[in-house]
């Protein structure tokens, strides 16, 4: 009953559009940046020049999502911490 009362003024098409925007926003801000971080972390020291160029392009494209996770991820090499 509560769900019907909440969604009655909103049409099903509007809800589908909002769901599509939420899905695309989640992909752009969360899923793809995390996949990009993991891929760059694995491949950073063995990339070729074209692969590195494409990585830079993807960083430019997905920068808002990458900057959201930057304070929480530590991608330093092993042995670069405390002495």
Curated annotation (Swiss-Prot):
Recorded topology in the membrane: Multi-pass membrane protein
InterPro entries per record: NADH-quinone_OxRdatse_su_L
Cellular compartments annotated: Cellular thylakoid membrane
Disulphide-bridged cysteine pairs: none
Catalyzed reaction equations: a plastoquinone + NADH + (n+1) H(+)(in) = a plastoquinol + NAD(+) + n H(+)(out); a plastoquinone + NADPH + (n+1) H(+)(in) = a plastoquinol + NADP(+) + n H(+)(out)
GO molecular function: oxidoreductase activity, acting on NAD(P)H, quinone or similar compound as acceptor; quinone binding
Pfam families: NdhL (PF10716)
Cellular-component GO terms for this entry: plasma membrane-derived thylakoid membrane
Family: Belongs to the complex I NdhL subunit family.
Function in brief: NDH-1 shuttles electrons from an unknown electron donor, via FMN and iron-sulfur (Fe-S) centers, to quinones in the respiratory and/or the photosynthetic chain. The immediate electron acceptor for the enzyme in this species is believed to be plastoquinone. Couples the redox reaction to proton translocation, and thus conserves the redox energy in a proton gradient. Cyanobacterial NDH-1 also plays a role in inorganic carbon-concentration.
Oligomeric and partner information: NDH-1 can be composed of about 15 different subunits; different subcomplexes with different compositions have been identified which probably have different functions.
Protein's recorded name: NAD(P)H-quinone oxidoreductase subunit L
Species this protein is from: Prochlorococcus marinus (strain MIT 9313)
